[in-house]
């Protein structure tokens, strides 16, 4: 037992405030320990009982996710999910957030976000093969938002480029709700290199516990608690809670760990991420149903006179904790030292289910593992039965609220003047949320490792060739994986359930658009405080939607991250919550990457087709057009029929597999007109399009948004075969689904007619100039 005389004297109220604990939490801690905690133990409980580590507000909602499927090898509970992608290959993947650190130290916050998610991947025995990111910032007309964007992109680029993992795709959106609280979500993928998946549960009493990697300092102390609280005007004072990363040590750590794992001498592995040594030791012990004892005097440190509290709560980067075979310890230490890494035995696995910490020859913490990991508190909340009144009011909006169309011009409620359709298309293309993200992704090395099939921006999803390090594939037919991150935050803010359904559907659609079969998801739930009625209702509605959509599309959840309290408070204590942003990271598999297709048109006179669903709604309510042209964020997002969504995606994949489709692009932000323009821009080719008239308004035809819609082009040399194929599969007998030709690829001009009426006539050069120079124009 811990000696009561070792308990620190501390101000309880102040300590609880620092650790973000309540007096009820403290009483529960005393009950679990059967005594009062000392200051070090209170800090350990503070980080382990934070939302960031134990999901105390979201755990009941997450339990409803579908987590099993034919390709799922490892689901939630380990460092990352694992799926079978065929040919005896296993893909490891996960998404994590680093929102609060990036708000106050954008470069290091984003850089260490990349480092942390990479460690989750290679801790499982996988070589990281790709990184994607999902970013949110306030509008770029504010210098502070420009600075945050510049810092975050630089941090992601620096760490990913230096460590040698390609950044292959992502998404970014701008909205004032993120001005005080940007979102930085990073997804990583890895290909398993070990014979067995490396898990985190400690085994074999008496086995040594090995610390590997960088030294421990005071950086990042309390980072998990910091990430579980709102940002205020004084949050800049929390800069010490932001970690400092070294990608070159991370690179050595990747190679050394994979080398060590292949020996079979590592029994269990856990990276030291959030809550550092506290979390890694507690989770290893709990997952193995054993205990761990650690002597802090043996931990390599970079600073003098560190307290036990600082050792245990430090989130210094590039550190790992292993349980290893005792007879192999010297061989392993030699391997790690060869890579310039510290490798010290700092403890052992013990039989009792406790985490016991010693420092300066005294026991400074002794806590049951269940209290830190398995049996953590759950905050139960009542869920609102009905949507809030402010949303019910917005849902009543319809297109009759807009000005009438007069002589092919539309009056903008935002700018108080009329514009032609061509002018509107150009204005939408220049909006930073729709415009090219080239200024961002050109800073990333997307080609390192030489397995990236399409460069960022060229396809709806990233496609990675799966190639072992020692390639023995003589046929040169490589399978691959596709990945996409998606979320329309505007839709989720207007209807959390429908908006999240759409996020899952769009991520699967993007993967299908390159010819890959969607397999599984990881998710990053970015929300505001769950302690408000509306905040928890948004979170609950979104989780219900993920469950429903993933079941319908047969894409189970393998894990992810919950980031709550994403809101900012100004000097007047006014709280601004972010738009709820449940980012979906979808992965899919493709048997032959040579069959993967990109977005741009391929040949002049190729036919352009549209597939969609009559049951999946399309509307200009909640659309980009309504926000960016009319200045209104209102209306109810369209409902998506998930069975039709699944059918449309399957139809497209089969058409790609049968070598008919040569390009495809999903219709999302900005509607059909923007999707067509993007295909023209990427190919430097035009399109001649003729569309059916809408009963009410032509802007509905051009700019409405909804699910289940994809444009694709058919090889001009296969028109007859394509026609026979459609007859054979009787596509139009599917009463809810339509497949129709809408035009053909032409040169230099995007021409759109609606019912024989010329709507727009824009040169590809003009489209490209607006699209490519928007974001870069701010810097």
UniProtKB/Swiss-Prot annotation:
Top-rank taxon: Bacteria
Active site per UniProt: 52, 98
InterPro entries: PRibForGlyAmidine_synth_PurL, PurL_linker, PurM-like_C_dom, PurM-like_C_sf, PurM-like_N, PurM-like_N_sf
Compartments, record wording: Cytoplasm
Subunit relationships: Monomer. Part of the FGAM synthase complex composed of 1 PurL, 1 PurQ and 2 PurS subunits.
GO MF term list: ATP binding; magnesium ion binding; phosphoribosylformylglycinamidine synthase activity
Annotated positions binding substrate: 97-100, 119, 243, 315-317, 563
NCBIfam families in UniProt: FGAM_synth_II (TIGR01736), PRK01213.1 (NF002290)
Protein name: Phosphoribosylformylglycinamidine synthase subunit PurL
CDD domains, per the entry: PurL_repeat1, PurL_repeat2
UniProt catalytic activity: N(2)-formyl-N(1)-(5-phospho-beta-D-ribosyl)glycinamide + L-glutamine + ATP + H2O = 2-formamido-N(1)-(5-O-phospho-beta-D-ribosyl)acetamidine + L-glutamate + ADP + phosphate + H(+)
Gene Ontology, cellular component aspect: cytoplasm
Class of the enzyme per the UniProt entry, highest EC level: ligase
Annotated binding of Mg(2+) 2, by residue: 120, 271
Role, per record: Part of the phosphoribosylformylglycinamidine synthase complex involved in the purines biosynthetic pathway. Catalyzes the ATP-dependent conversion of formylglycinamide ribonucleotide (FGAR) and glutamine to yield formylglycinamidine ribonucleotide (FGAM) and glutamate. The FGAM synthase complex is composed of three subunits. PurQ produces an ammonia molecule by converting glutamine to glutamate. PurL transfers the ammonia molecule to FGAR to form FGAM in an ATP-dependent manner.
EC code(s) of this entry: 6.3.5.3
Annotated metabolic or biological route of this protein: Purine metabolism; IMP biosynthesis via de novo pathway; 5-amino-1-(5-phospho-D-ribosyl)imidazole from N(2)-formyl-N(1)-(5-phospho-D-ribosyl)glycinamide: step 1/2
Residue positions binding ATP: 55, 94, 523, 560
Predominant location: cytoplasm
Protein family: Belongs to the FGAMS family.
HAMAP family: PurL_2
Organism of origin: Prochlorococcus marinus (strain MIT 9312)
GO BP annotations listed: 'de novo' IMP biosynthetic process
PANTHER family given in the database record: PHOSPHORIBOSYLFORMYLGLYCINAMIDINE SYNTHASE SUBUNIT PURL
Keywords from the UniProt entry: ATP-binding, Cytoplasm, Ligase, Magnesium, Metal-binding, Nucleotide-binding, Purine biosynthesis
